[in-house]
Amino acid sequence: MDTSLFSLFVSILVFVFIALFKKSKKPKYVKAPAPSGAWPIIGHLHLLGGKEQLLYRTLGKMADHYGPAMSLRLGSSETFVGSSFEVAKDCFTVNDKALASLMTAAAKHMGYVFWLEMRKIAMIELLSNRRLQMLNNVRVSEISMGVKDLYSLWVKKGGSEPVMVDLKSWLEDMIANMIMRMVAGKRYFGGGGAESSEHTEEARQWRKGIAKFFHLVGIFTVSDAFPKLGWLDLQGHEKEMKQTRRELDVILERWIENHRQQRKVSGTKHNDSDFVDVMLSLAEQGKLSHLQYDANTCIKTTCLALILGGSETSPSTLTWAISLLLNNKDMLKKVQDEIDIHVGRDRNVEDSDIKNLVYLQAIIKETLRLYPAAPLLGHREAMEDCTVAGYNVPCGTRLIVNVWKIQRDPKVYMEPNEFRPERFITGEAKDFDVRGQNFELMPFGSGRRSCPGPSLAMQMLHLGLARFLHSFEVKTVLDRPVDMSESPGLTITKATPLEVLINPRLKRELFV
């Protein structure tokens, strides 16, 4: 009897000990630090400033105080903000799959809902190196035509003195034409008969729709903060998003129908001259049939994504690059001297020359570091509970990675706010690439939601900058410094026009 009681007593002690041991070993829930001052209902929304606030700078200042991993409550939505390359690496490697889902109001109504499948198709069929090589003539000819437009303006103004141009607008038109031709075989802006063509009204509608798209995507709506209140549409933004989508759909539908008619006329002799043709061929081969939407919706999705991906980002990067050079005249002279040494002044710069223009490549990298087109990587949500940088991130938490802050980290970059292209040649960043493998420099993002077209973007940036700097002397009016103010929005764009004086530095034959 005593033995049985003793055994029972020992068993109870062992059970209690095991239970207490397990409890002590159970990981504690650790939440990333949160700024003080959260209000009931709205949380930290009031700390982010108004519509003119540069959100990436505001979040950067918060990171200085609260650390590189931070929690925010934006309405009813929990948000995790990462502001160091270590946190970014944790997000885009170990937790890339867990943090790969988000549908904001803008994405829901304007980005379509099956972008992942279409991204795979675009990467394989549209943005491969082979396909980009086939479309190389479009990129080169549009840059040549853009340079010719500037030269023609100089001639029209007398052909003897420097003329003033708004380079920001010129770059936007040139890149838009380039992408539009690749996607739909259309040229909307500038010379070459674009403005006098039958598509003038369509071009106006398209530009208006794209501008409205970027404006709406940059707006933080009530439903983004309070998803359950989205049906109320208190601000009317969701209604406007749907209307903008319909307006763009009308034009996209017209493109597809025009291509179908052209293919009927050409019969079996048609070739896949642009992305719409490629997608129509895929549809005819049944390669889009496994998707949940019809072929037209698939094609419109891909076309819109490709156009939006480059229509604002690439011209913005070139605008910043030229602005930085104008404020650093010794560097402007250095890169023009480099081009003259490797190319001379008896021919135009070609793609094959870029590999020798090391300083020019460094200028593009340094510009992308200081002014990443997408300063905040968002549109992600935790699909499951995960741990980032030692902090618990519950399912449903939204993720923001502050690329702007990461790329100005003084622990990585010496004098991080200074324009120093040399850092990518012989300095601390000489081994950094821009394609998302080095988390200290990721202007195109990283992981599953990174930009699918960095190769095309870098080709446009390198040749576009090289051709302009080789073709023209450029300076500001009265040699004034360029205003480097940034405009609030989805991308980092220059707040003011880039008005400069240009003068040809090559012989006439190279412009005609």
From Swiss-Prot:
Subcellular location: Membrane
Annotated transmembrane regions: 1-21
Membrane topology: Single-pass membrane protein
Pfam family, one: p450
Keywords assigned: Heme, Iron, Membrane, Metal-binding, Monooxygenase, Oxidoreductase, Transmembrane, Transmembrane helix
The protein's required cofactors: heme
Binding site for heme: C451
Induction section of the entry: By iron deficiency.
CDD domains cross-referenced by the UniProt entry: CYP82
Cellular component terms per the entry's GO annotation: membrane
EC number assigned by the record: 1.14.-.-
One example GO MF annotation: oxidoreductase activity, acting on paired donors, with incorporation or reduction of molecular oxygen
Coiled-coil residue windows: none
Stored PROSITE patterns: CYTOCHROME_P450 (PS00086)
Root EC class: oxidoreductase
Main location, first listed in the record: membrane
InterPro entries hit by this protein: Cyt_P450 (IPR001128), Cyt_P450_CS (IPR017972), Cyt_P450_E_grp-I (IPR002401), Cyt_P450_sf (IPR036396), Plant_Cytochrome_P450_Monoox (IPR050651)
Family: Belongs to the cytochrome P450 family.
Protein name: Cytochrome P450 82C3
Organism: Arabidopsis thaliana
Taxonomic lineage from the root: Eukaryota, Viridiplantae, Streptophyta, Embryophyta, Tracheophyta
Originating gene: CYP82C3
